[in-house]
């Protein structure tokens, strides 16, 4: 039996690289080298069956993994980043104390090319777990008229943070995630 240690698994690196992108007034934070042990998380993801059963997210086009782990160790980091780069108006501790370990598992053929918002308030965060040779595309951001403003490229152990009301869509070049290759990213909704 495999045992899970959240303190080790979800430990954050002490030397992340932070970059605030500005897409025509839209702020998107990119943090590289986010987790100290991303290989442990990736191994856990690859060893967990993903499902199309998504009753809490009925419009999600792909599969996901949704497991209850203790993510409270992420609170201090997210509070700091949100207050530093955005307006802190959510209870991060409360959100992450109830948040599950949610992983989007998507292939090119099942992706929805239409930009969407996640919610009208709060923040969303994606953390990529595809290794370098698997990475393709990224996350596209749009204005309210569906004009593309910019792309954040997919990169292993990269965290992207943005407000949930911002229109976005996974950018996956045609045929990039097929067969046994899936786009895998941890997703957090804070707020």
Regions found by a protein language model. Give the residues of each.
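Catalytic core of non-heme Fe(II) oxygenases with the double-stranded beta-helix
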Residues: 100-191
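Non-heme Fe(II)/2-oxoglutarate
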Residues: 2-98, 110-112
């Amino acid at each position: 039996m495999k045992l899970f240690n959240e303190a080790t698994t979800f430990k954050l690196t002490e030397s992340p690289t932070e970059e605030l992108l500005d897409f025509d007034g839209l702020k998107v934070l990119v943090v590289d080298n986010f987790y100290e042990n991303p290989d442990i998380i990736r191994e856990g993801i690859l060893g967990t069956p993903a499902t199309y059963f998504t009753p809490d997210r009925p419009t999600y086009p792909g599969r996901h993994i949704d497991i209850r782990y203790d993510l409270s160790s992420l609170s201090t980091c997210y509070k700091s980043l949100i207050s530093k780069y955005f307006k802190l108006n959510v209870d991060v501790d409360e959100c992450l104390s109830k948040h599950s370990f949610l992983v989007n598992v998507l292939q090119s053929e099942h992706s929805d090319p239409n930009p969407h918002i996640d919610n009208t308030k709060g923040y969303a965060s994606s953390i990529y777990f595809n290794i370098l040779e698997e990475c393709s595309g990224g996350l596209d951001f749009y204005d309210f008229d569906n004009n593309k403003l910019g792309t954040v490229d997919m990169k292993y152990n990269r965290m992207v943070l943005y407000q949930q009301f911002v229109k976005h869509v996974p950018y996956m070049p045609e045929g990039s995630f097929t067969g046994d290759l899936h786009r895998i990213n941890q997703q957090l909704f804070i707020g």
